[in-house]
From Swiss-Prot:
Belongs to the radical SAM superfamily. Lipoyl synthase family. Its cofactor is [4Fe-4S] cluster. Its main location: cytoplasm. The lineage of its organism: Bacteria, Bacillati, Bacillota, Bacilli, Bacillales. Binds 2 [4Fe-4S] clusters per subunit. One cluster is coordinated with 3 cysteines and an exchangeable S-adenosyl-L-methionine. This is Lipoyl synthase. The gene is lipA. GO terms for molecular function: 4 iron, 4 sulfur cluster binding; lipoate synthase activity; metal ion binding.
Length: 298
């Protein structure tokens, strides 16, 4: 077995306690009954049991379950996507009511087959959730929508409470990790979002363990801050299958703590960093912290 395909043994700090209580099974049944998808399941998130069973939160994945891209870190299915489901926004909104969520994250597969990248359905989902859940904060996590400004404007005009778009990795590794996305296009996407709606916090995420250096990570932090990104999440990359990129390094919790301190010193209003941190992990706490910092700055 070559170094590139070898599975590294996971360290103790990555072992997860599984919890499949009534909250977990109830949420799973509800998602199936409403024909909805979650990135928690599709992307094999390691926190699914904590979020579903303990925190009773979930990240809805709209626009189908098949992505038009094939990023080498991601477990989501790729291929020819299904037709748009125009009733999906209302079903998501109804599910948020049923779950009693105070904060909801809405993400989507990349839909490069659509002229608007799925922006219209994304925006309508935000509006539907807002109509039926006026006190629920809404976080959106879109693809770069091919970098088309009109698509981003359509989404930002729906006034989500937070705009999240992930650069995923450092500049040096970006082409290898996500060939059909572009590092600078993602930075521009984040910058334009802030220009369109200055009061809406922006957020991005970086996976570590793909071969990046500390200098690479600091450069990425500087790039995000130069484009006015407010919140950063840092988490350990975990190889979904042998077909995906291998893990080069497992970062210990102490190193994540160091990276968090560096990020906060750069001016991020909030940084969530840890081995099991994912973009939507404790998202409700992140948006609350960012809004408090924004209010203090005024």
């Amino acid at each position: 077995m070559t170094k590139q395909t070898e599975y590294k043994r996971k360290p103790e700090w990555l072992k997860i306690k599984l919890n499949t209580n009534e909250n977990y099974t109830g949420l799973k049944k509800m998602m199936r009954s409403k024909n909805l998808h979650t990135v928690c399941e599709e992307a094999k998130c390691p926190n699914i049991h904590e979020c579903w069973a303990v925190r009773k939160t979930a990240t809805f994945m709209i626009l189908g379950a098949v992505c038009t891209r094939a990023c080498r870190f991601c477990a989501v299915k790729t291929g020819l996507p299904t037709e748009l489901d125009l009733q999906e926004p209302e079903r998501v909104a109804d599910s948020v009511v049923q779950m009693g969520l105070k904060h909801v994250v809405i993400t989507a597969v990349a839909r490069d087959d659509l002229k608007d990248g799925g922006a219209a359905v994304f925006a309508e989902t935000v509006r539907a959730v807002r109509r039926k859940n006026p006190f629920t904060s809404i976080e959106v996590l879109p693809s770069d929508m091919a970098g088309v400004e009109e698509n981003l404007k359509m989404l930002m005009d729906a006034k989500p409470d937070i705009l999240n778009h992930n650069i995923e990795t450092v500049r040096r590794l970006s082409n290898r990790v996500r060939a059909r996305a572009k590092y600078d296009r993602s930075l521009e996407f984040l910058r334009r979002a802030k220009e369109m709606q200055p009061d809406i916090p922006t957020k991005s995420s970086i996976m570590v363990g793909l071969g990046e250096t500390r200098e690479d990570l600091i450069e990425a932090m500087d790039d995000l801050r130069a484009n006015n990104v407010d919140i950063l999440t840092l988490g350990q990359y975990l190889q979904p299958s042998k077909k995906h990129l291998p893990v080069i390094k497992y970062y210990p919790p102490a190193e994540f703590a160091e990276l968090k301190e560096i990020a906060l010193s750069k001016g991020f209003s909030h940084c969530e960093a840890g081995p099991l941190v994912r973009s939507s992990y404790h998202a409700d706490e992140q948006v609350r912290s960012a809004k408090e910092k924004t209010a203090e700055a005024k």
